[in-house]
Amino acid sequence: MSKVSQQNSTPGVNGISVIHTQAHASGLQQVPQLVPAGPGGGGKAVPPSKQSKKSSPMDRNSDEYRQRRERNNMAVKKSRLKSKQKAQDTLQRVNQLKEENERLEAKIKLLTKELSVLKDLFLEHAHNLADNVQPSSTENTTNPDKAGQ
């Protein structure tokens, strides 16, 4: 089986050429690959609006640079304060929930004790009722003297 392959190169956009490859022997067509057109021509395509901003580095002594740094520093400070406040709020909420949990656990203990006392009273009362209730027919049949009177 002989393998015949073909490569066609076509110029592309932004200095990138597209290579089309076909392999006739296997009957499959390979996916096109992107390669740089020339030396130093690789990399991502950058939109013109961002390209012009990044092309000239700012002078560290310029007013615009100082203003941008000041705005950035203020934004960072604000972000850090917000983060600290969020951490404090979370800690406060944790403490509140711990206190509430302790109160609820104490209430559970109290109610458990009360339930135990009430159960004991109920069982004692039920036992007393059972002891006080005796069949009257057994008294009459066991004592023949009272039965005839």
Swiss-Prot record:
It comes from the Eukaryota. One of its GO terms (cellular component) is nucleoplasm. Residues 62-125 form the bZIP domain. Residues 97-118 are annotated as: Leucine-zipper. Residues 1-92, 128-149 are annotated as: Disordered. Residues 28-37 have a biased composition (Low complexity). Residues 1-12, 131-149 have a biased composition (Polar residues). The keyword Chaperone does not apply. Residues 56-72 have a biased composition (Basic and acidic residues). Keywords: Activator, DNA-binding, Isopeptide bond, Nucleus, Transcription, Transcription regulation, Ubl conjugation. It holds the Pfam family bZIP_2. One of its GO terms (biological process) is B cell differentiation. The keyword Oxidoreductase does not apply. There is a cross-link at residue 3 (Glycyl lysine isopeptide (Lys-Gly) (interchain with G-Cter in SUMO2)). Binds DNA as a dimer and can form stable heterodimers with CEBPA and CEBPB. Interacts with ZNF638; this interaction increases transcriptional activation. Belongs to the bZIP family. C/EBP subfamily. Transcription factor that binds to the promoter and the enhancer regions of target genes. Binds to the enhancer element PRE-I (positive regulatory element-I) of the IL-4 gene. Binds to the promoter and the enhancer of the immunoglobulin heavy chain. Binds to GPE1, a cis-acting element in the G-CSF gene promoter. This is CCAAT/enhancer-binding protein gamma. It comes from Bos taurus.
